[in-house]
Curated annotation (Swiss-Prot):
Catalytic activity: L-homocysteine + L-serine = L,L-cystathionine + H2O
Residues annotated as binding pyridoxal 5'-phosphate: 413, 521-525, 612
Pfam families, sorted: PALP
E.C. no: 4.2.1.22
Quaternary assembly: Monomer.
Gene: cbs-2
UniProt protein name: Putative cystathionine beta-synthase cbs-2
Superkingdom of the organism of origin: Eukaryota
Entry cofactors: pyridoxal 5'-phosphate
UniProt keywords, alphabetically: Amino-acid biosynthesis, Cysteine biosynthesis, Cytoplasm, DNA damage, Lyase, Pyridoxal phosphate
EC class (word): lyase
Function recorded in the entry: Putative hydro-lyase catalyzing the first step of the transsulfuration pathway, where the hydroxyl group of L-serine is displaced by L-homocysteine in a beta-replacement reaction to form L-cystathionine, the precursor of L-cysteine. Required for inter-sister DNA repair during meiosis. May play a role in promoting apoptosis in the germline in response to endogenous and exogenous DNA damage. Dispensable for survival in response to atmospheric hydrogen sulfide or hydrogen cyanide.
Location(s), subcellular: Cytoplasm
Pathway(s) of this molecule: Amino-acid biosynthesis; L-cysteine biosynthesis; L-cysteine from L-homocysteine and L-serine: step 1/2
Length: 662
């Protein structure tokens, strides 16, 4: 294979602006509603900060002439829209203040704070009044106000970006767009693009569901009329949105659910063979605390108190079977996918521009943004691979849609990945997870339709009350249950050997790779990536990071903590999927440094990463200094997941202060 020149992105904004969002057909809903037309959804929640508004925010800053790093800027925006503007501001080093009516920041307050955005709730009843007050404040202080160009930016971003992507995907009869937040300008821009052939209808759906709902500016209403956007009012659609998530694995927010429901109604009136595209406004991140997200109708489940001790006869330190690569590598996601599972992999590699220099590091540091996988983490890869192997070979158990229950002990992300795969493939899913794992993970699992069983943090892996022990007991009680077992399944390292490592090598092109730094949990990530990197770049050094309190690298030197807060890395046993010989050296990590680094990456690079990502980057920089890597050296760090799972944890100042981290 001929490698390209380096394809890593200069900033996370470049990754967003140069990567189209994919379209996915709703096959199950088509059958359920007996439609003769096809409905596709455009996955705008896989943009860099999670919504369609990313396009408008980036364009608005491009259109704002004269804004320099360090300048103060105002914008009127709430919810996911505010997060989009805050992300761009973080990358550009701009001091952003977001204004909005009361309540508009409720679900995104910690995100905005971590991004460094100041928020001001104005004593007004709607966004139009907020824009007027913000404009007066900006003029009084001599501050640049983006409000004057936001609507135009959204119009142009969707006219020149979203609409051509839809057209490129194929013939479209109708496009449905939520009108919440900047959706009205987006709908107008898309309609303006398709007006040229008058064969595509654009429908705007008004819904009260969005956390960032705002009335469009008067000039936008004129554009909606000018470009013949058909307006429909949608009823409450929370129940349907849950159904969309559980049925198709489309992790969309409520205004997007309302738009899909309207698309179904529209499709019934269209000729057979028509195509309707729904532009999804945002994902589930900003709604995880909403009541509609928490009720999935699953009855609580516990294993029987009395059980045969033989069910615990299990050794997670031995891998079951060998693994070898057989698949062909595809470097990019196609524009149209077969299912949302095809939006797993091909995540962007981004160069850090500010953090390394701030910590005395001269070399190039690139981060692989795994939070842009379909389910939000690198564990999506192994979930998909393990299910594919089981479907093909019947190992470790035969899978039957509608009958099989997938059971998995996990720290959360593998469970989310498996829940996503189970939703699409038609399996039931039960996740056992320690109590310390975030409530956001639990809610995400719930909305995907999984049953969750929590277990004590202090239970050792071989205890009957641990997440592993409970999973083993439940497997023997539930007919047709299968544990795919990430600790022993060869599909775990294989996914990273075949895909993740290949993507890193492709994106680095003909550049040398001096150092790769990876956090270790089950060990599948580091084993798979390390083997492939060593095969193709034998001079590269692969370093694993393991938290104090974990034993993956042996006992901690000095007093070991009984508990560590960073999720997704470390264990109290050596999993069978970890090949210790594939790792050149190990570093021990602490919680405080990990979380502070994650917050710094978010604030200065605009990369919305999780705590284990901060852990990997902090200790990568430490290793860079130790090795005294020169300016032309290249370092790659994997960011396993994003902020969605930690909104009430390390993003929250009170949580950090309570643990002595701030």
């Amino acid at each position: 294979m001929c490698l390209p020149t380096i394809k890593a992105f200069k900033t996370i904004l470049d990754a967003g602006s140069h990567r189209a969002t994919q379209l996915v057909p709703l096959k199950k809903l088509k059958a359920e509603f007996q439609l003769k037309s096809d409905i596709y959804v455009k996955l705008e929640y896989l943009n860099i900060s999670g919504s369609l508004e990313d396009r408008a925010a980036h364009r608005a800053f491009e259109m704002s002439n004269g804004i320099q790093r360090g300048d103060e800027v105002y914008v009127t925006a709430g919810g996911s829209s505010a997060v989009s503007y805050a992300t761009v501001a973080a990358v550009k080093g701009v001091r952003l203040t977001a204004h909005a009516p009361p309540g508009a920041f409720d679900q995104v307050r910690t995100i905005l704070s971590t991004l460094g955005t100041k928020i001001v709730e104005l004593p007004v009843s709607n966004f139009r009044e907020a824009r007027l007050q913000a404009d007066l404040l900006a003029k009084r202080r001599g501050v640049y106000n983006l409000d004057g160009i936001c609507e135009k930016a959204a119009f142009l971003a969707n006219l020149e970006g979203t609409a051509p992507e839809i057209e490129k995907a194929g013939k479209t009869s109708a496009v449905v767009v939520p009108l919440d937040a900047g959706g009205a300008s987006a709908a107008a821009g898309i309609a303006a693009y398709f007006l040229k052939d008058q064969k595509t209808t654009v429908v705007g759906v008004r819904s009260s569901a969005s956390a960032s709902a705002s009335a469009p500016a008067p000039e936008t209403e004129v554009l909606l009329q000018k470009y013949k956007v058909e307006i429909r009012d949608a009823p409450e659609s929370y129940t349907f949105t849950r159904h969309l998530i559980e049925t198709e694995g489309i992790m969309a927010g409520p205004s997007s659910g309302a738009a899909v429901l309207e698309a179904i109604k529209l499709a019934k009136d269209l000729p057979a063979g028509s195509v309707v595209v729904v532009v999804l406004m945002d994902g589930i991140r900003d709604y995880l605390d909403a009541d509609w997200m928490k009720v999935n109708g699953k009855k609580p489940i516990k294993p029987r108190e009395i059980f045969d001790p033989k069910v615990l006869d299990y050794d997670p330190t031995k891998m079951v079977g060998e693994w070898k690569s057989s698949s062909k590598f595809r470097p990019e996601r196609p524009l149209v996918l077969d299912s949302v599972l095809d939006a797993i992999g091909k995540t962007p590699l981004v160069k850090l521009q500010h953090v390394p220099k701030a910590h005395g590091v001269r070399c190039n540091v690139y981060v692989k943004c795994e939070f842009l996988n379909a389910g939000g983490s690198t564990k999506d890869r192994i979930a998909k691979k393990m299910v594919e192997i089981a479907e093909k070979t019947g190992k470790p158990g035969a899978l039957t849609p509608g009958a099989t229950t997938l059971i998995e002990p996990t720290s959360g992300n593998t469970g989310i990945g498996l829940s996503l795969v189970a939703a699409v493939r038609g399996y039931k899913c039960l996740i056992t997870m320690p109590e310390k794992m975030s409530k956001e993970k639990s809610t995400t699992l719930s909305v995907l339709g999984s049953t969750i069983v929590r277990t004590p943090n202090e239970a050792a892996f071989n205890s009957p009350s641990s997440h592993i022990g409970v999973a083993l007991r439940l497997k023997h009680e539930i007919p047709g249950a299968v544990i795919l077992d990430q600790y022993c399944n060869p599909g775990n390292p294989l996914a990273h050997y075949e895909e993740t490592a290949e993507e890193i090598l492709w994106d680095m092109g003909d550049r040398k790779i001096d150092l790769v730094v990876l956090g270790a949990g089950t060990g599948g990530t580091i084993t798979g990536i390390s083997r492939k990197i060593h095969e193709r770049r034998p001079n590269a050094i692969v370093v694993g990071v393991d938290p104090n309190g974990s034993i993956l690298t042996g006992p901690t030197t000095g007093p070991a903590p009984d508990f560590y807060e960073v999720e997704g890395i470390g264990y109290d046993f050596i999993p069978g999927t970890l090949d210790e010989k594939s790792v050149d050296s190990w570093l021990k990590s602490d919680d405080k440094e990990s979380f502070l680094m994650a917050r710094e990456i978010i604030r200065t690079e605009g990369i919305l990463c999780g705590g284990s990502s901060g852990c990997a980057v902090h200790y990568a920089l430490e290793q860079c200094r130790k090795l005294d890597l020169p300016e032309d050296a290249n370092v790659v760090v994997l960011l396993p997941d994003g902020i969605r799972n930690y909104l009430t944890k390390f993003l929250d100042d009170d949580w950090m202060k309570a643990r002595g981290f701030l």
